[in-house]
């Protein structure tokens, strides 16, 4: 492991020198690639520096303890040694986690799709609740959220389907754990007998594709335009600015109605279509590693019930790892960091175990 870390440190230094060369900025694509590679290695290098420093301090403290005669000084040195001996395994574990193979899509922005499932109007309202939860979480993270497309339900405030783009630092690395079926248990406002109803909504988190990721033939596309709808379903535009694109070989559809011009909506819809096709490619690649991924947190099986939101008990349970929180109101306000961190930790632990097999 330490030979690999030393090699990474040398690579990081080489990248730093390349980026410092004034000629590097002349090729923007190459510069961005170098800068991303440099940034990806920075955290590992800094962690390795902390580990190396702690090891050096431990060696020096042991040498000092062997030569020191003063009892008080020896006691202080012994305390320093014990602190460092406790600190080193933690630093080594951090390095092992950082060295785990990264998902190539982790640094990407995402397209999120939220769909109401079983439960009628209550499911549509729950889909809207999930949308607000993710929007508030994104705001806390300093990410940008753009609502791309939506279909409202018959009940005011509900959605049958919502598509949004979330952009920022390492969005997919964080949000990929949210894919799956989310279940809610609560008493609807219209329930006069006080009975608890169970409803569901599905969430799909797709890493946003770049133009180079997927080759799409123009002949394989059908473009339709229509008037974008406002809240409540009324047509607020007199011109057909909304765009729907159908990929004929697969039947996959992408639509956008939120931008002001047809051209902007077309560009957004193409990004969504590329993302959906890219997701199919990724799924095919991930299938080849299915045996390994069975031991990991499921991040993509959208047929699996992953989480339950129980309102009467103010409880949120993630069924994949047995995580339970009784802070449901805060979670629905976007404070889902603890849930996601627990999923990340479980994922890392499983992957470390798989690496050691």
Curated annotation (Swiss-Prot):
UniProt xrefs under NCBIfam families: prfA, PRK00591.1
GO CC list: cytoplasm
Protein purpose: Peptide chain release factor 1 directs the termination of translation in response to the peptide chain termination codons UAG and UAA.
Gene Ontology molecular function terms on file: translation release factor activity, codon specific
Main location: cytoplasm
Similarity field: Belongs to the prokaryotic/mitochondrial release factor family.
Assigned keywords, A-Z: Cytoplasm, Methylation, Protein biosynthesis
Intracellular or extracellular location(s): Cytoplasm
N5-methylglutamine found at: 234
Keyword Nucleotide-binding: no
UniProt name for this protein: Peptide chain release factor 1
InterPro entries: PCRF, Pep_chain_release_fac_I, Pep_chain_release_fac_I_sf, Prokaryotic/Mito_RF, RF-1
PTM comment: Methylated by PrmC. Methylation increases the termination efficiency of RF1.
């Amino acid at each position: 492991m330490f030979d690999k870390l030393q090699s990474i440190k040398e690579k990081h230094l080489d990248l730093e020198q390349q980026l410092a060369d004034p000629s590097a900025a002349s090729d923007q694509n190459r510069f961005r690639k170098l800068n991303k590679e440099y940034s990806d290695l920075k955290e590992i290098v800094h962690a390795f520096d902390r580990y190396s420093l702690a090891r050096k301090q431990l060696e020096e403290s042991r040498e000092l303890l062997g030569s020191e005669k003063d009892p008080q000084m020896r006691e202080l040195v012994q305390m320093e040694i014990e602190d460092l001996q406790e600190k080193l395994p933690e630093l080594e574990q951090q390095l092992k986690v950082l060295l785990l193979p990264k998902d190539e899509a982790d640094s990407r922005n995402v397209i999120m799709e939220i769909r109401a499932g079983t439960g009628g109007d209550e499911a549509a309202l729950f889909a809207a609740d999930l949308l607000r939860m993710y929007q508030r979480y994104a705001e806390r993270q300093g990410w940008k959220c753009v609502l791309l497309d939506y279909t409202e339900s018959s009940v005011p405030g509900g959605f049958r389907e919502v598509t949004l783009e979330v952009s920022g630092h390492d969005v997919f690395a964080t949000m990929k754990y949210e894919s799956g079926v989310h279940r809610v248990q609560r008493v609807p406002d219209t329930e006069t007998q006080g009975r608890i109803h169970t409803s569901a909504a599905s969430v799909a988190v797709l890493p946003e594709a770049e133009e180079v990721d997927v080759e799409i033939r123009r002949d394989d596309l059908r473009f339709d335009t229509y008037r974008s709808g406002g809240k409540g379903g009324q047509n607020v535009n007199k011109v057909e600015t909304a765009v729907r694109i159908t990929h004929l070989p697969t039947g996959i559809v992408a639509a956008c109605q939120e931008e002001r011009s047809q051209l902007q909506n077309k560009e957004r819809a193409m990004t969504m279509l590329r993302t959906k096709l890219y997701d199919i490619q990724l799924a095919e690649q991930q299938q080849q590693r299915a045996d390994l991924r069975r031991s990991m947190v499921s991040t993509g099986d959208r047929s699996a019930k992953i989480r339950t939101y129980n309102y009467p008990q103010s409880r949120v349970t993630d069924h994949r790892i047995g995580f339970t929180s009784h802070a449901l109101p805060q979670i629905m306000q976007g404070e889902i960091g603890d849930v996601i961190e627990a999923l990340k930790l479980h994922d890392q632990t499983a992957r470390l175990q798989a690496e050691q097999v």
